[in-house]
Design a protein with these regions (language model features):
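Surface-exposed loop/edge segments in extracytoplasmic proteins
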Residues: 90, 368-369
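Residue-level detector of functionally pivotal "anchor" positions at catalytic/ligand-binding pockets or at interdomain
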Residues: 328-357, 367-368
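Hydrophobic alpha-helical segments, especially N-terminal targeting/anchoring helices
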Residues: 83, 241, 302, 346-347, ...
Length: 369
């Protein structure tokens, strides 16, 4: 009994010590980036993998049925599921009428010609030997847990190749609502990851498309010359663009310990393409997105431009679901649009809030200040 208690104590001390370790600094284009401290992280739920899905590698907030999060696994290309942010119960299972490649690695949602679509990156290729890459897409279905807990859709796909003619491993995909462009990011160990783009259309058919090279995420010298720890940004596992197109998140996991995750936040200027933002902003703001229990963090998505979620690729434990909320600074309130019943609608950083005597709330009633 003493031995068991000693082991438990040792494990607890180890966890505590890991959680107290300062995150290593991130070097990007030769400079050490400064942490962005404008985001508050909290665990909003725990994903019950037996009731939902294992090894989540991509998530996307539902736009058709707000309040739910779509999730897909890199273990199956047969279905996706939807759950709420608590992750306790599956609200919907969407089966694919046909299987399109097995290694799904990321997903995103977006609007095209007035319709909401879901995009899935069927492009994982760890050994860079496959060479068959595609983006799976279909119109986002409504979520109705009571009347339609399980439905079937017919997926489409866009087959593509890289402009260099080589094979690449990928784990990150994002869709830009402003310009209707899909962005794909390679996952590279101990080297610089690359960004590619493809305009979305629904009429590509079966013809292979060639991606356009956009940029590198950093330079090789950021990583050091064969030394550990590697301080540069590599091993990209997820990405997403806010619905209004203003913010870009790119997530990785570090090689020091897989629990360390960096999230780069890029801010897009008006009239700028995503490609122009990534090329211009060589000093993005890294958000502290590491946690002792966020093992293999491979999924990220925006709810709105002030809130995003992350979760992890786990098959032997229920991973936490984290919610990041941007801190609100009353000094940046720019518009007061309506006042009724002692409540005022205010616009802060392009996001609408309700201010009352009790504090500041999101439109769905969540208190943020």
């Amino acid at each position: 009994m003493k031995n068991i208690k000693s082991q438990i104590l040792l494990a607890s001390l180890l966890v505590a010590s890991l959680s107290c370790i300062a995150a290593p600094r991130l070097v990007y284009f030769g400079d050490t980036l400064q942490w962005n401290t404008d985001w508050v992280k909290k665990q909003c739920g725990t994903l019950d993998i037996k009731a939902n899905i294992i090894e989540v590698s991509g998530i996307a907030c539902s736009r058709v049925t707000p309040g739910y999060i779509w999730m897909q696994s890199d273990e199956t290309a047969k279905y996706i599921i939807a759950t709420d942010e608590k992750g306790e119960k599956r609200a919907c299972k969407v089966n694919m009428s046909k299987t399109i490649r097995w290694d799904w690695e990321d997903m995103s949602g977006g609007v095209y010609e007035g319709k909401n679509y879901l995009f899935i990156g069927a492009f994982g290729d760890n050994d860079e030997t496959d060479g068959e890459y595609s983006v799976v897409w279909f119109e986002e279905p409504a979520i109705d847990p009571e009347n339609a807990p399980e439905i079937t859709v017919t997926p489409n796909r866009i087959k593509y190749v890289y402009p260099d003619g080589k094979k690449h491993n990928n784990e990150a995909l994002m869709y830009d609502n402003r310009d209707q462009v899909i962005y794909i990011i390679t996952k590279v160990y101990y080297n610089v990851c690359q960004v590619f783009s493809l305009p979305f259309r629904t009429d590509y058919g079966d013809e292979e498309q060639t991606l356009t090279y956009v940029c590198d995420l950093g330079v090789k010298s950021d990583l050091g010359e064969g030394t550990k720890p590697y301080k540069g940004f590599h091993l990209v596992t997820a990405a997403d663009i806010s619905p209004d197109g203003k913010y870009i998140l790119i997530k990785n996991h570090n090689n020091i310990v897989a629990t360390y995750c960096w999230v780069l936040l890029f801010t897009r200027e008006e009239g700028e393409s995503v490609a122009e933002t990534l090329i211009r902003q060589t000093h993005p703001e890294p958000i502290k997105a590491y946690n002792t229990y966020e093992w293999q963090g491979e999924a990220i998505c925006w709810l709105d431009s002030a809130t995003f979620y992350t979760t992890s690729d786990a098959d032997d434990g229920n991973p936490p679901i984290y919610k990041y909320t941007k801190k609100v600074n009353a000094a940046v309130e720019t518009v007061q649009t309506k006042k009724a019943d002692d409540k005022t609608l205010v616009m802060i950083d392009n996001v609408m809030y309700i201010r009352s005597k009790q504090g500041l709330f999101t439109l769905d009633g969540r208190k943020v200040q």
